[in-house]
Amino acid sequence: MQILLANPRGFCAGVDRAISIVERALELYGAPIYVRHEVVHNRYVVDNLRKRGAIFIEEISEVPDDAILIFSAHGVSQAIRAEARSRNLTMLFDATCPLVTKVHMEVARASRKGKEAILIGHAGHPEVEGTMGQYNNAEGGMYLVESPADVWNLKVKDEDNLCFMTQTTLSVDDTSEVIDALNARFPNIVGPRKDDICYATTNRQEAVRDLASDADVVLVVGSKNSSNSNRLAELAQRVGKPAYLIDSAEDIKEEWITGISLVGVTAGASAPDILVQQVIERLKSLGADSVQELHGREENIVFEVPKELRVEVKEIS
């Protein structure tokens, strides 16, 4: 049995930055550090940060005075940001992915201009809640759609004053169908100058499509609440291959790979490489005898942490 590794896979620049912000805050200021929502959607990452002194909360009211607070990579609404700033906090750091912030700016711009805005995204996802929360113009409107059917059922105030944007971690194929419906339903709608679906989401979906075309079964390392990881498993299934979303090597069931020649392995943008390595070791214990990494797009994007966290511990001692 051979293991095929998708390329690229695992951490993206936004996730790497968000985790680094929490780690640096813990190193520089010590525990506890409060984080609104899981900093990224990965159980292994969150559990490790929790052990080091990060406290994950959902409500700003849970944060005591004089504490240090970090917003997660998914972003927050203007209301949450204002609430945090009104508190007597020692420091406030924003780990929102810069590519999510780009979408926030698009929504805020639409709100200022009085344009109605339509967001393509999954209801209940924290990124969607934060993005929707950038709009505050009562004379306009902010709407959420998930499917072409939602588009055809949508009622807006002015069909000639519309724009749209998307969640950054969606299925490229599904989103294309929704955009086609938007353009058909609202011919004058304006989209973003550049795709809102981020480079990492697009690259990993392209890579898993290539992987699934060769593999007999695909294992996607990622947590159940990770949007981009779920999309990878769904895409592999659409190619016609069995695909399983796993948090760790322990989740692998032997019957998944019984009689299989090629096992494909990839990881969502919030899954660390150590989990992939553990999956490889588990597969080797079940009979895998070689590992091959596929060719893919090279990624060299880096997002800096806030300047306050780019200092040595001794500088603030």
Swiss-Prot record:
Pathway(s) annotated for this protein in UniProt: Isoprenoid biosynthesis; dimethylallyl diphosphate biosynthesis; dimethylallyl diphosphate from (2E)-4-hydroxy-3-methylbutenyl diphosphate: step 1/1; Isoprenoid biosynthesis; isopentenyl diphosphate biosynthesis via DXP pathway; isopentenyl diphosphate from 1-deoxy-D-xylulose 5-phosphate: step 6/6
Xref: CDD domains: lytB_ispH
Pfam entry (one): LYTB
Position of the signal peptide: none
Keyword Iron-sulfur attached: yes
Residues engaged in binding dimethylallyl diphosphate: 41, 74, 125, 226-228, 270
Residues reported to bind (2E)-4-hydroxy-3-methylbut-2-enyl diphosphate: 41, 74, 125, 168, 226-228, 270
Top-level taxon of origin: Bacteria
Cofactor annotation: [4Fe-4S] cluster
Any single GO BP term: isopentenyl diphosphate biosynthetic process, methylerythritol 4-phosphate pathway
EC number: 1.17.7.4
Role of this protein: Catalyzes the conversion of 1-hydroxy-2-methyl-2-(E)-butenyl 4-diphosphate (HMBPP) into a mixture of isopentenyl diphosphate (IPP) and dimethylallyl diphosphate (DMAPP). Acts in the terminal step of the DOXP/MEP pathway for isoprenoid precursor biosynthesis.
Family note: Belongs to the IspH family.
Record's subunit section: Homodimer.
Protein name: 4-hydroxy-3-methylbut-2-enyl diphosphate reductase
Species of the source: Photorhabdus laumondii subsp. laumondii (strain DSM 15139 / CIP 105565 / TT01)
Underlying gene: ispH
